[in-house]
């Protein structure tokens, strides 16, 4: 069983379906031809998340029979992905959805009709990209290039139309669209960063302004990219975990007789494969401001709404329903020697910790965006997403840059309690997370063995504050904690001023009592809620 079998005249669909493989319900060749002749959607970033989510929901939309165009994928950084994971398989891939009960769902994705390398050194590919950007039919360009992918610098701005960064290449292609008649298009980031459309806009604007200043392009081009009737940069909220190809999944596919199961590691250290494995749960909420129409991705489950609502969904996720739970688990998980989030969910204290913190303390001030139910969202996080045995997420990864995350993930909830005049005594487990951070900074686990704290720009500075404290030492002076918990840059507010300083100090004393004190303190406060 190989992906390319699907395109052959004597393809045995029954064999695949008998083994649980969901096959495309549309004419793959007809969709490819229509897309080639009248392209509507180009996507930058050929990584795993693209195939697992945007391409997959388009595949679902095509399966309804109500749409007839695919997506053209473009890679601007790691060209080996195109050469090794796309073209040998005629752009087909297998999506393996990892269920929280340990089973998998298998679906062949055939919605990607072309794969191109965005670089002038690949002359044919670049010429095809120019042709696509000149096409009146083009509606949107989307991106999963990570937050760093939107960056630019003076050296690249100075390269003019030969820029090598993704935003520079995009702007050069937009200039072709401008010259073809100032044709409308929407540039839609689907990267997991707040206000993501602004990253695209900032990049395009920086290149366009520089090129106008340098006399490379006419001033009208800058007017074009700033004209919201021509070019828009909507926000979106995307949420789906797509780990690198999983050995367990490879073994399951091999057992089926599916031969395209090898992992590909590129020279740039991208992990890819002809298959992509991802969690079953997914959310894509997009600001509905498109200047030239858009593919009907709502047929595959995408939600379209206002910018305000997209922001509210992001706020719900980041300040209440997902990210705070992650950080609480990561701080205590590291001290309790866990290396997998899913394993932490089998620990009664830790599971109850995030459950009670989320439902009892954070949910009373949750932002309800309307398009997603916060209670359903957090319930899915606790019951499906975090316990998923296929998710290789580690508390050590999530603990990276914790000092930069605490103000948004916990400070915002505390501020809402204060602003609304709510009973601050309802906050017990959130202060326990913040107290746990002081203990985490000592880099000793609950058995008093050293561990390597995750990288953090303020790590050395904050460790120096708690340096006078020793775990297990009786009658020590904890006044140094004030220098930590007054830090508005870390917590979003002065926790002493807010009335939580003494409470947190008391918890820190308990956590520092000695060997086993982290577990004992956690159990005490969680059980009492």
Which functions belong to the PLM regions below?
Residues 1-44, 48-529:
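Substrate/ligand-engaging "lid" and interaction regions
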């Amino acid at each position: 069983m190989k992906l390319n079998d699907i395109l052959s005249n004597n393809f045995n669909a029954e064999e695949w379906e008998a083994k649980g493989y969901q096959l495309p319900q549309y004419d793959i060749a007809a969709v490819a031809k229509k897309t080639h002749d009248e392209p509507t959607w180009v996507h930058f970033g050929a990584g795993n998340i693209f195939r697992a989510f945007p391409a997959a929901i388009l595949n679902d939309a095509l399966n309804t029979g109500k749409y007839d165009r695919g997506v053209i994928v473009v890679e601007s950084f790691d060209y080996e992905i195109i050469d090794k994971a796309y073209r040998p398989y005629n752009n087909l891939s297998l999506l393996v959805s990892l269920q929280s009960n340990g089973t998998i769902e298998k679906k062949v994705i055939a919605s990607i009709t072309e794969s191109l390398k965005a670089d002038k050194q690949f002359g044919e590919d670049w010429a095809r990209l120019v042709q696509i950007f000149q096409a009146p039919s083009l509606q949107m360009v989307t991106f999963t290039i990570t937050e760093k992918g939107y960056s630019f610098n003076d050296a690249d701005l100075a390269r003019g139309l030969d820029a090598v960064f993704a935003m520079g290449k995009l702007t050069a292609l937009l200039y072709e669209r401008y010259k073809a008649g100032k044709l409308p298009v929407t540039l839609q980031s689907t990267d997991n960063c707040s206000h993501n459309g602004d990253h695209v806009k900032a990049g395009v604007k920086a290149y366009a302004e520089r090129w106008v200043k340098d006399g490379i392009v006419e001033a009208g081009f800058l007017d074009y990219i700033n004209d919201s009737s021509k070019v828009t940069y909507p926000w979106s909220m995307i949420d789906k975990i797509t780990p690198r190809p999983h050995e367990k999944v490879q073994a399951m596919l091999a057992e089926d007789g599916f031969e395209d199961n090898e992992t590909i590691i590129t020279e740039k250290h991208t992990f890819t494969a002809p298959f992509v494995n991802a969690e079953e749960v997914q959310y894509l909420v997009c600001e509905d401001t498109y200047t030239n129409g858009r593919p009907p991705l709502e047929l595959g489950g995408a939600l379209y709404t206002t910018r305000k609502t997209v922001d509210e969904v992001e706020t719900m996720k980041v300040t209440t329903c997902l990210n705070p739970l992650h950080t609480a688990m990561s701080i205590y998980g590291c001290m309790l020697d866990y290396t997998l989030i899913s394993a932490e969910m089998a620990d009664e204290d830790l599971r109850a910790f995030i459950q009670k913190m989320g439902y009892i303390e954070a949910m009373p001030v949750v932002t309800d965006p309307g398009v997603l139910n916060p209670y359903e969202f957090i319930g899915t996080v606790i019951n499906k997403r975090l316990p998923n045995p296929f998710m290789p997420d580690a508390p050590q990864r999530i603990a990276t840059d914790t000092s930069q995350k605490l103000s948004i993930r916990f400070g915002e909830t505390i501020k809402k309690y204060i602003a609304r005049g709510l009973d601050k005594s309802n906050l017990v487990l959130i202060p326990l997370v913040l107290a746990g951070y002081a203990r985490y900074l000592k880099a000793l686990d609950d058995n008093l063995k050293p561990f390597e704290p995750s990288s953090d720009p303020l790590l050395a500075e904050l460790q120096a504050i708690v340096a006078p404290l020793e775990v297990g030492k009786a009658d020590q002076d904890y006044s140094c904690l004030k220098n930590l918990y007054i830090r508005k840059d870390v917590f979003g507010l002065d926790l002493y001023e807010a009335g939580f300083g003494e409470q947190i100090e008391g918890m820190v004393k308990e956590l520092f009592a000695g060997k086993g004190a982290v577990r004992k303190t956690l159990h005490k406060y969680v059980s009492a809620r």
